[in-house]
């Protein structure tokens, strides 16, 4: 039985909200990073009977689910998050894990959270293993652009980079870059998502540019040295399976790619029973079983 509690990290600003699902003191400890718009509770409370975080804990993991700044119950301006902010937030979660558990720490994430989890594992030597539901080379996002509007808005955003000092706070709707109907397969889940009062539906121009359109502060993906498992749905339209095959082929570390047959984008919630064992098994293998 997993023990659940929530708390705030207040050692620095902004305050960060954590949701903990604890299995046992010696279980592998895994930090979870949510996707775009979302927060930790999105993966535990939004769909009745689909508590992904609890399921991971019941599979033998201690889960530290982080609300990135500007999201959920964490501090910071809504929709304001740079790549450097995200890496700092995750480092603070690792600090917490080391202070309260042990050093057998992994990281996992979904969608944008999978992308950020990959880079956090690459950059933070204390993270020993990763499972990423979706990845993307943030030095070059062009291979995954597929919506007609991408080919107008992405060049426009790049052109506005010199004006970030003036226009950086401009709110850009999530729908400009992400098609909501491609996230969930079930219409009722899409409705639940849209009704979630803690979700962020616009990001500042500076956020879009910092995370997706500024290659200079991103290390090459080939530098990854940790064992990493990549997960993707066979029919994911946002970050396709073929892209993940090419990404995995470039990695030099111990790696594994699992393409979930018949699945779309939202593996943690719409394919929970398939996803949880894939995540838990990797961490038990590379962080040690209880």
Name these PLM-found stretches.
Residues 226, 240-249:
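Short alpha-helix in the alpha/beta-hydrolase fold that links the catalytic acid
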Residues 51-75:
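Conserved alpha/beta-hydrolase
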Residues 112-197:
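Alpha/beta-hydrolase-fold enzymes
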Residues 72-104:
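Catalytic nucleophile-loop/oxyanion-hole region of alpha/beta-hydrolase
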Residues 224, 230-232, 236:
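Short beta-strand/loop motif that positions the catalytic acidic residue
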Residues 1-23:
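N-terminal cap/lid segment of alpha/beta-hydrolase-fold proteins
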Residues 36-51:
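The serine-hydrolase catalytic nucleophile loop
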Residues 263-276:
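Catalytic histidine-centered segment of alpha/beta-hydrolase-like enzymes
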């Amino acid at each position: 039985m997993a023990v659940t509690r929530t708390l705030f990290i207040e050692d620095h600003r902004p305050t960060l909200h954590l949701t903990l699902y604890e299995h046992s003191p010696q279980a592998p400890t895994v930090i979870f990073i949510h996707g775009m718009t979302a927060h930790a509770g999105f993966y535990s409370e939004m769909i009745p009977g689909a508590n992904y975080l609890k399921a991971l804990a019941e599979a033998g993991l201690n889960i530290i689910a982080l609300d990135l700044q500007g999201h959920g119950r964490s501090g910071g301006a809504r929709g304001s998050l740079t790549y450097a902010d995200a890496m700092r937030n995750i480092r603070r979660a690792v600090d917490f894990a080391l202070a309260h558990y042990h050093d057998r720490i992994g990281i996992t994430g979904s969608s944008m959270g999978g992308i950020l989890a990959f880079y956090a594992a690459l950059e933070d030597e204390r993270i020993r293993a990763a499972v990423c539901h979706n990845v993307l080379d943030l030095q070059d996002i062009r291979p995954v652009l597929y919506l007609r509007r991408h080919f107008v808005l992405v060049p426009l955003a790049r052109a506005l980079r010199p004006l970030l000092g003036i226009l950086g706070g401009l709110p850009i709707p999530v729908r400009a870059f992400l098609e909501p109907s491609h996230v969930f397969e079930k219409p009722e889940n899409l409705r639940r998502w849209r009704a979630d009062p803690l979700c962020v539906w616009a990001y500042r121009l500076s956020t879009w540019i910092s995370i997706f359109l500024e290659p200079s502060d991103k290390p090459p993906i080939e530098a990854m040295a940790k064992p990493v498992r990549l997960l993707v749905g066979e029919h994911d339209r946002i970050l396709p399976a073929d892209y993940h095959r090419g990404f995995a082929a470039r990695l030099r570390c111990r790696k594994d790619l699992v393409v979930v047959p018949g699945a779309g984008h939202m593996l943690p919630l719409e394919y929970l029973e398939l996803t949880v064992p894939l995540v838990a098994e990797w961490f038990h293998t590379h962080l040690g079983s209880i």
